[in-house]
């Protein structure tokens, strides 16, 4: 195969992932309000796609227009391909909302009322709502030499209003801009009695369209057109000018709202001259214009399921399983001393991790606590426990990653609170994101210091621990806990990388470990020995790993990859990758665990990791991979993390050589296998 065709386009692969998510919104086996949630997830993902990936392609095209990307194409060619795919996905999305989901919701007495269908009573209520809730807040900006075109915030809802007449000062009118503050709901619920006893909603844009004239008394409103600008949201911090990372991040967060435009969304009814006017204001081309049939921000529909009390239209609730042994012992440390604890979230409760930190904060024998924070949410019992530990006089060290994309403001806030409580807060290593998920407790027992560690594949975030699938291990293994301590010393101090006993870390040893393990399986296959690689991750795009997998496949290694999102490897290509199979699991839970298993002559070397197989994870982040060696725990990780995923025939998508996906289905006579439901049955409470 030609060199330029060996690696697929990562942006097209990411859009393909969102097509699989959108398929959940089409699936009639998914409860109706959950289908609406999946539609919103796709919209949110697309926003981030334009803010990050499309923005990067634009910058690359500007700086290096002739440099070929990993997919063998130049940036301009890739932008054209990606734009076409994005347009197709967005059209599909709005068709689904307008022609499928809205009619099905209406049959369940859940209505989205358009202006032309408002009853007299609804019109009266909506006008009162506008006068009471919107009119005092909205600020129209007339465009003239003393009122230049305003800078809309990233992803904010705005309206271009065409006017006729003269204002109070005798100025001729032309156009004004109305910005809808973010505090306003984009979907407004109507009283039940106005909706025949059901649920009714109107879009904020419809309310404003109907009453925008009240913002311009005495003027004639000729047209009102909603628009939304998506901006480049990359944060850039100059290392040479850097004095205080936290202050620099706070400044950049403000600037992010006003980055370069990358996408302009307007309604499909917007006239051409208004579209052209807006494109000129934002220095965008027609290729960056997206006309949609409906509200320009479907993300805000995610409020609707929470406003509708219809359990029959939502997923049934599940209760995470709890460790029975934890209730039989006075201390989690006593339990972990006996044997390590493996947790598989959300099927098993995240509580043992929280309990470990709570107990550490209250235990007089605990001397020090260390933890990394990447994403932890706006409310965190874990961080509260760290603050209590610091206030109790314990040595508390917290590595807060301030550059966690779209969580920067939240992490800045936690860093301030932790410092005020007396914790030592460090911001990692400039130029490397601290993505490792690790915690360490140092406790005095019988006159000697004993260490306990937690290592995980997911964030210390109690909210996402109920949605994302992840593994975590709590252990007192002396070599692993010593390694975790070494990693904290590396991050917080200065010096050369320490020698690790069992853990592998990025950016120093993890990539080499993966390459070496693949090479070993390759040699075993060449020698006629059984050789197999099974791995699960969010993304696979690192070219040297992909080439190593191609070599392994050519040698006869059987390779099964479970890649939820981006995958730029081509599976099943004769002479290149015929022994590689790739599948993606898309279901109620977001598959987030990273698990690697290398057969190694039957030893089945198994690791859980914070790292995907991407260049950023191997070379620009601090990551960990921990071996799972206890026989029962290894058996669980292989079964729950890999084998059951490979058996799934209800939510699995099978990747094709061209980068497309086909949904798996049970063969004739084969029973259904549903990874996530089966794990709830196996592990849930």
Swiss-Prot record:
User: Which superkingdom, per the lineage?
Assistant: Bacteria
InterPro entries in the record: PP_kinase, PP_kinase_C_1, PP_kinase_middle, PP_kinase_middle_dom_sf, PPK_C_dom2, PPK_N_dom, PPK_N_dom_sf
Q: Where does ATP bind?
A: 45, 468, 564, 592
Q: What Gene3D superfamilies would the database entry show?
A: Endonuclease Chain A, Polyphosphate kinase middle domain, Polyphosphate kinase N-terminal domain
* Cofactor(s) needed: Mg(2+)
Keywords, comma-separated and alphabetical: ATP-binding, Kinase, Magnesium, Metal-binding, Nucleotide-binding, Phosphoprotein, Transferase
From the UniProt record, list the reaction(s) this protein catalyses.
Answer: [phosphate](n) + ATP = [phosphate](n+1) + ADP
Q: Name one GO biological process term.
A: polyphosphate biosynthetic process
Q: Which residues bind Mg(2+)?
A: 375, 405
Q: Which residues are catalytic?
A: 435 (phosphohistidine intermediate)
Q: Name one GO molecular function term.
A: metal ion binding
Q: How is it modified after translation?
A: An intermediate of this reaction is the autophosphorylated ppk in which a phosphate is covalently linked to a histidine residue through a N-P bond.
Q: What class of enzyme is it?
A: transferase
Q: Name one Pfam family in it.
A: PP_kinase_C
Q: What is its EC number?
A: 2.7.4.1
Example of a GO cellular component annotation carried by this entry? polyphosphate kinase complex
Recorded hits in HAMAP family, A to Z, give:
Polyphosphate_kinase (MF_00347)
Q: What does this protein do?
A: Catalyzes the reversible transfer of the terminal phosphate of ATP to form a long-chain polyphosphate (polyP).
The UniProt entry's sequence similarity note says: Belongs to the polyphosphate kinase 1 (PPK1) family.
UniProt protein name? Polyphosphate kinase
The protein's organism comes out as: Neisseria meningitidis serogroup A / serotype 4A (strain DSM 15465 / Z2491)
User: Could you read off the lineage of the organism from its UniProt record?
Assistant: Bacteria, Pseudomonadati, Pseudomonadota, Betaproteobacteria, Neisseriales
Q: Which gene encodes it?
A: ppk
């Amino acid at each position: 195969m030609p060199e330029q065709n060996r690696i697929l386009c990562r942006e097209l692969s990411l859009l393909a992932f969102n097509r699989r998510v959108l398929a959940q919104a089409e699936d009639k086996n998914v409860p109706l309000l959950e289908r609406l949630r999946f539609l919103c997830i796709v919209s949110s993902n697309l926003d981030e796609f334009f803010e990050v990936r499309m923005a990067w392609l634009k910058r690359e095209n500007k700086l290096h227009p002739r440099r070929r990307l990993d997919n063998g194409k130049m940036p301009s060619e890739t932008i054209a391909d990606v734009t076409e795919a994005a347009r197709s996905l967005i059209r599909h999305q709005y068709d689904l909302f307008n022609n499928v989901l809205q009619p099905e919701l209406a049959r369940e007495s859940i209505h989205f009322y358009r202006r032309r269908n408002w009853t007299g009573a609804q019109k009266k209520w909506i006008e009162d709502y506008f006068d009471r809730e919107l009119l005092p807040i909205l600020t129209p900006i007339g465009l003239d030499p003393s009122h230049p075109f305003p800078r809309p915030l990233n992803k904010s809802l705005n309206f271009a209003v065409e006017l006729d007449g003269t204002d109070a000062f005798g100025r001729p009118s032309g156009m004004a801009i109305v910005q809808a503050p973010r505090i306003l709901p984009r979907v407004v619920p109507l009283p039940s009695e106005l909706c025949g006893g059901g649920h009714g909603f109107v879009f904020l844009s419809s309310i404003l369209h109907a009453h925008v004239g009240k913002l311009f008394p005495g003027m004639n409103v000729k047209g009102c057109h909603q628009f939304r600008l998506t901006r480049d949201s990359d944060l850039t911090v100059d290392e040479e000018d850097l004095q205080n990372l936290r202050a620099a991040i706070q400044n950049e967060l403000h600037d992010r709202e006003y980055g370069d435009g990358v996408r302009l969304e307007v309604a499909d009814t917007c006239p051409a001259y208004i579209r052209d006017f807006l494109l000129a204001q934002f220095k965008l081309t027609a290729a960056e214009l997206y006309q949609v049939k409906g509200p320009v921000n479907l993300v805000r529909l995610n409020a609707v399921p929470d406003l509708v009390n219809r359990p029959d239209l939502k997923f049934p609730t599940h209760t995470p399983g709890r460790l029975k042994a934890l209730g039989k012992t006075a201390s989690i440390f006593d339990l972990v001393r006996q044997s390590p604890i493996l947790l598989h979230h959300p099927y098993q409760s995240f509580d043992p991790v929280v309990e470990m930190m709570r107990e550490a904060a209250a235990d007089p024998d605990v001397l020090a606590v260390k933890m990394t924070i990447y994403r932890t949410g706006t409310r965190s019992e874990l961080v509260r426990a760290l603050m209590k530990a610091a206030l109790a006089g314990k040595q508390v060290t917290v590595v807060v990653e301030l550059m966690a994309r779209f969580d920067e403001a939240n992490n800045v806030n936690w860093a301030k609170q932790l410092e005020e409580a007396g914790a030592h807060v460090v911001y990692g290593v400039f130029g490397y994101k601290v993505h490792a998920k690790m915690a360490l407790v140092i406790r005095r027992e019988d006159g000697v210091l004993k260490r306990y560690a937690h290592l995980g594949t997911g964030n210390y975030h109690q909210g996402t621990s109920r949605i994302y699938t992840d593994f975590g291990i709590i252990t007192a293994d002396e070599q692993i806990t010593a390694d975790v301590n070494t990693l904290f010393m590396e991050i917080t101090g200065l010096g050369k990388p320490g020698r690790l006993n069992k853990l592998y870390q990025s950016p120093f040893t993890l990539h080499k470990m993966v390459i070496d393990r693949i090479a070993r399986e390759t040699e075993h296959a060449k020698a006629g020995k059984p050789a197999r690689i099974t791995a699960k991750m969010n993304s696979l795009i690192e070219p040297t790993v992909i080439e190593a997998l191609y070599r392994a496949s050519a040698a006869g290694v059987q390779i099964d990859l479970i890649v939820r999102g981006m995958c730029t490897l081509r599976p099943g290509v004769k002479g290149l990758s015929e022994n590689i199979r790739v599948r993606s699991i898309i279901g109620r839970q977001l598959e987030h665990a990273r698990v690697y298993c290398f057969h190694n002559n039957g030893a089945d070397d198994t690791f859980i990791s914070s790292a995907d197989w991407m260049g950023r994870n191997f070379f620009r982040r601090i990551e960990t991979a921990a071996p799972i060696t206890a026989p029962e725990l290894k058996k669980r990780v292989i079964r729950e993390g890999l084998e059951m995923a490979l058996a799934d025939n209800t939510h699995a998508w099978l990747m094709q050589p061209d980068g497309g996906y086909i949904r798996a289905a049970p063969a004739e006579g084969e029973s259904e296998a549903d990874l996530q439901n089966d794990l709830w049955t196996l592990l849930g409470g």
